[in-house]
């Protein structure tokens, strides 16, 4: 499955980047393709392109702040608190698989 994700926490420091790493590791274990955009204290990094969005199966927004979803129109979007990704990254991805079947 091709997953695009955004991680963002209120401070934009640690959890944003830890969640990114946890999602990447879980996706690798499950055989998924993933790209994670971070919206942290230093701004947006690894920004998702329109082409990547078009090719994605699902968009995962793991954020405790507001994320603009306009660019994801027509795509399935799953929103989940960043704390869930921090604790259960593989479980979050498994739930997405279930919803997409």
Locations of the language-model features?
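Short, well-ordered alpha-helix to beta-strand connector turns
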Residues: 56, 74-75
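Ser/Thr/Gly-rich flexible loops in soluble cytosolic domains mediating phosphotransfer, phosphorylation
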Residues: 3-4, 77-101
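Short glycine-rich or small-residue beta-strand-to-loop segments that form or flank ligand, phosphate
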Residues: 2-11, 60-61
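Short, well-ordered beta-strand core segments
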Residues: 59-60, 77
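Glycine/Thr-rich phosphate-binding loops of Rossmann-like dinucleotide-binding domains
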Residues: 14, 69-70
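Glycine-rich phosphate/diphosphate-binding loop of Rossmann-like nucleotide-binding domains
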Residues: 1-2, 12-27
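Short, polar loop motifs at secondary-structure junctions
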Residues: 62-67
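N-terminal beta-loop-helix "entrance" segment that forms/cooperates
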Residues: 29-56
